[in-house]
Regions:
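C-terminal domain-boundary segment and adjacent tail
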Residues: 259-276, 314-321, 480-494, 524, ...
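Metal-dependent polysaccharide deacetylase catalytic core of the NodB/CE4 family, i.e.
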Residues: 95-108, 361, 368, 372-378, ...
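Helical hinge/lid and interdomain linker segments adjacent to catalytic or ligand-binding clefts
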Residues: 33-47, 54, 293-375, 505, ...
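Non-catalytic C-terminal accessory domains or segments of carbohydrate-active enzymes
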Residues: 268, 367, 754, 759-919
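Active-site beta->alpha N-cap acidic-glycine motif
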Residues: 76, 463-571, 614, 619-641
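Catalytic grooves of carbohydrate-active enzymes
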Residues: 226-239, 483-513, 530, 609-612, ...
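A glycine-centered loop/beta-turn motif at secondary-structure junctions
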Residues: 277-278, 310, 333, 363-364, ...
Length: 919
């Protein structure tokens, strides 16, 4: 069998060399977006994105990948608003385009051509653009005489050839230019044309339909281009409020074999092309007056975001006291959730009027507890509601009928104080109440525009700090927001196994164990935990505790030596837990009481709090003085209340540091509610704070004041966040001071022992953070009967309901396999950051990875079976579905015959080539 193993190694090398070339290339997809505030993640679904370079998007910020930016360039017209126009010789401007308020250029002028190449194209090339959309190629017809037309056309030909001569690798898309196409077709990447079915007339400001005569003329021109082997693109214009027509128009263009893009008149929205992006962002509107002005403490962030994350959506938080988004909503947002703090929260920014925008653009909107504005009869009627006049409401209120969606964790308890007499005229009622004198209220409903739960029937407060859901948030959000059935990016699992990560906060590093002969906590932790459980672990340090100019200068050499020994362990990655362990990260925070006393800021002599010193300074110290050769830290673990402001987060990102901590996942058998499961994190401006999946021993021991064995209850949290829904990975998270007491150390051992007995996939904390960030970046686009999935390749697991079917495993899908857990089917993606998901009712016959506790660094389907390179940090097992009769071959392990439908192989930690041969 030696020759088989040698052949395997050779084939794996081939896989790695061609890792980016899996599958048959799909037809070209193109998007056009000319406005500010572009939806970057969503645009990356398209192979080519044409942007206005004067706006905020550029190649440097866009990054590498299969999606490329093309720069919009007006050739035949000069826009007075652009800087380059002001530098033009007035003699080059020979007329006006009154409809678009621009000047027509003499494209036959050699001096203009040189200016255009040097001052327009060249700066864009230097900025990183390698593709250009050349617009206004036909504008010379507006100003040139008939006799001048040949010279104008020759000038355009020379200009296009000059671009390619200067930059042979430049890709050019022409907007029309049919009269010159034959002369320059060898220099053209694609040809576009506007208004095949629907147009926009700038003179009248009206959208309209294209006549059949005009359409046939344009189709004949495009057909001539296609015969030359050059792709063609049709750009049509539809009102942004008519998403259905947008979708239908794109489908009609696509059916003609033409690449479509259908959007609004200004190309300022996320339209529909060959692909339709399935938006994965929910806009969450909250009242900035709630939670002492910090969105972290709002009901929206604390309770609604986690279920929306589970359903596959990130949430963009927006304060109702600030101007509401003015950009086109359709295509950008999957829906809107409003959780106002009062009946007047939305009046300042006219939430009522903005709600009508959502309805017009067919973006579902949900209201929780209240609408955020006074609901008058006229507006209620527009929402399909009828307010019932009444003289008085006689208590008590009672439940007349309720859908099974209610009573999720607590039953609804009618309250006459929040009773709003109204009847649903259009939609599906979910909860109907009645007063003692017979007045009714449809307190919750699914409506044509979304849905609402009015009053105290969203959740109920059990105790001062405990809440429970009354409505099932998973089902309600799914139904009310019309969330489509599609693959869901999952941060809890990879290759079918639940993830395991561990990270340690630096508190107590220098403390001494309390038993006789006890050493420093750091030494005890290394001896009792780190050397025993050799799984990936992230160790953070409070640098003022170790530094020569810190708290313990006389002990610094000893403490630094211990830290170096820990960080040198192969399974340890380093992190910073700040310089002085700030309890508060924002100057306006005023935390008091036992938490502030327990999580204090270290008082370092002669030190004044400084964000740079806390973040980049502490990271630099660890890298320069403590990390071994070949290892660097780029992780920052928040301290204290773990509520960094936007400035602190910005500095962490600018230091190229991944960040984690915060959140509050404390679900247990004595606190059995998913309100105690935190979301993935929180957005603060453009920055994202990643929450720890689970909480540390501090909160299981009453802030380290007693019950020091309390961390053993983390096992309850692990179990309850795995079933009936897998909401979190397993995260063993603790402080160095757990090694100072026998009870806490035993609790820690128990948590580790439990984890070691489970089939888990061990990863580093940095890798989990990157998966969460990739969750936010992942774009999913519908392409006929399949979904295109793209991201940075850090998140590689998707989830679908079991009843949705099975993934098509044919070559080109980049789906390595699947496995079932609870009611879901988990799909495992290969490397590369791109996959195509097509579902079928048929069980696959080909072999596939059922589960694996290791990364896939390379993966390919072959006529004989599978080839892959796997890499694990601990010994792991690979299980192959449909493996009966197949052989598993590795260069370092024996050939194992398949004896059942599931064939498996156990491998030591490290990287391994593996082939599955079924012939």
């Amino acid at each position: 069998m030696a020759h088989l193993r040698l052949q395997l190694v050779v084939m794996i090398i081939v896989i790695l060399a061609a890792a980016a070339a899996w599958g048959t290339p799909a037809p070209l997809s193109v998007a056009f977006y000319y406005a500010d505030n572009p939806p970057v993640n969503e645009l990356k679904a398209f192979d080519i994105v044409v942007v206005d370079p004067d706006h905020s998007l550029n190649p440097a910020s866009y990054g590498d990948g299969p999606s490329r930016l093309f720069a919009y360039v007006s050739v035949g017209e000069a826009d007075p608003q652009r800087i380059s126009t002001n530098k033009m010789d007035p003699a080059w401007l020979i007329g006006d385009n009154k409809a678009w308020k621009s000047r027509v250029v003499d494209v036959s002028n050699p001096e203009w051509r040189q200016f255009f190449l040097d001052k327009v194209v060249e700066p864009l090339w230097q900025a990183g653009y390698r593709g250009f959309f050349l617009d206004t190629l036909d504008s010379y017809h507006l100003a040139a005489s008939k006799e001048a037309l040949p010279a104008m056309q020759a000038g355009l030909v020379e200009t296009i050839r000059a671009i390619r001569k200067r930059h042979p690798e430049a890709r050019l898309i022409l907007n029309r230019g049919f009269e010159i196409f034959e002369r320059i077709k060898g220099d053209v990447f694609a040809v576009a044309a506007e208004s095949l079915f629907h147009n926009f007339n700038p003179a009248t400001g009206q959208y309209g339909s294209v006549t059949e005569e005009d359409r046939q003329w344009l189709l004949s021109r495009l057909s001539e281009v296609q015969k030359s082997g050059v792709p063609v693109i049709a750009i049509d214009y539809v009102p942004p409020g008519n998403r259905s027509l947008t979708r239908q128009t794109a489908a009609k263009i696509k059916a003609l074999g033409i690449t479509p893009w259908v959007s609004d008149k200004a190309l300022s929205g996320l339209g529909v092309g060959r692909l339709e992006v399935m938006p994965r962002v929910i806009l969450g509107l909250y009242d900035g007056a709630e939670g002492d002005g910090d969105a972290f403490f709002t009901n929206l962030q604390r309770y609604a975001v986690m279920p929306l994350n589970y359903l596959g959506y990130s949430v963009k938080l927006h304060d109702l006291s600030t101007p509401l988004p003015a950009e086109i909503l359709a295509g950008r947002y999957a829906g809107v959730v409003v959780w106002a703090n009062s009946g007047q929260s939305g009046e300042k920014q006219d939430l009522k009027k903005w709600t009508l925008r959502c309805i017009t653009e067919e973006v579902p909107i949900v209201f929780l507890e209240r609408f955020g504005f006074p609901l008058d009869s006229e507006f209620a009627a527009g929402l399909g509601l009828e307010l019932t006049p009444f003289n008085r409401l006689a208590p008590p209120a009672r439940v007349v009928s309720k859908d099974a969606i209610f009573g999720f964790e607590q039953q609804p308890l009618p309250n006459i104080e929040t009773f709003l007499p109204m009847k649903l005229k259009s939609g599906t009622p979910l909860l109907q109440l009645a007063s003692a004198n017979g007045i009714t209220s449809d307190a919750a409903a699914i409506t044509p525009w979304g849905g609402y739960v009015y009053g105290k029937y969203v959740l109920t407060q059990l105790l001062e700090s405990q809440a429970a859901w009354v409505v099932d948030p998973f089902r309600f959000f799914k139904q009310a927001l019309r969330l489509p059935d599609m693959p869901i990016p999952d941060t809890t699992t990879e290759n079918g196994l639940r993830l395991l990560l561990s990270h340690v906060d630096g508190d107590g590093f220098e403390s001494r164990a309390e038993w006789r002969g006890g050493r420093l906590a750091a030494e005890e932790l290394k001896n009792s935990i780190l050397d025993r459980y050799k799984i990936p672990v992230t160790i953070s340090l409070i640098t003022s505790s170790l530094a020569p100019d810190g708290l313990y200068p006389k002990k610094s050499a000893q403490l630094e030596g211990i830290a170096r020994g820990i960080l040198a362990l192969p399974w340890v990655e380093g992190a910073s837990h700040s310089f002085s362990h700030p309890f508060r990260w924002k100057p306006d925070q005023s935390d008091t009481g036992i938490e502030a006393e327990s999580w204090h800021t270290v008082k370092v002599p002669n030190y004044t709090f400084n964000l740079d010193a806390e973040i980049s300074g502490s990271l630099n110290y660890i890298n320069e003085r403590l990390m071994p050769p070949g290892k660097r830290t780029r992780i920052f673990q928040w301290t204290g209340n773990c509520l960094p402001g936007e400035d602190a987060l910005r500095l962490a990102y600018q230091a190229d540091a991944l960040n984690i901590n915060g959140g509050s996942t404390l679900i247990s058998t004595s606190n059995l509610t998913v309100t105690e499961v935190a979301p993935l994190g929180i957005s603060r401006g453009p920055w994202f704070q990643v929450f720890a999946p689970n909480q540390n021993e501090n909160v299981y021991t009453n802030l380290w004041s007693g019950n020091f064995y309390g961390y053993s209850r983390i096992i309850e949290t692990f179990q309850l966040t795995d079933s009936p829904r897998r909401l979190k990975p397993v995260n063993i998270y603790y402080h160095f001071y757990s090694a100072t007491k026998e009870a806490s150390l035993n609790a820690l051992r128990r948590a580790y022992d439990w984890a070691m007995a489970q089939p888990l996939f061990s990863i580093y904390t940095s890798e989990y953070i990157e998966k969460v960030l990739d969750f936010n970046r992942t774009v999913i686009a519908r392409d006929d009967d399949s979904w295109l999935v793209r991201n940075n390749g850090k998140l590689r697991e998707l989830r679908i309901p079991r009843e949705s079917g099975y993934p098509d495993l044919t070559a080109g899908s980049n789906i390595a396999g699947f496995t079932d857990n609870n009611d879901n089917r988990y799909l495992h993606l290969g490397p590369g950051g791109e996959a195509r998901v097509r579902l079928t009712s048929s069980v696959p016959a080909a072999p596939y990875i059922e589960t694996s506790g290791a990364y896939l660094d390379a993966f390919e389907r072959t006529p004989a079976g599978l080839q892959m390179i796997t890499r694990g940090y601990v010994p792991f097992e690979v299980k192959i579905g449909n493996g009966q009769g197949c052989r598993l071959i590795t260069p370092s392990a024996p050939v194992l015959p398949g004896a059942s439908d599931t064939t498996s192989i156990k491998l030591p930690e490290g990287s391994h080539a593996l082939a599955v041969s079924c012939q």
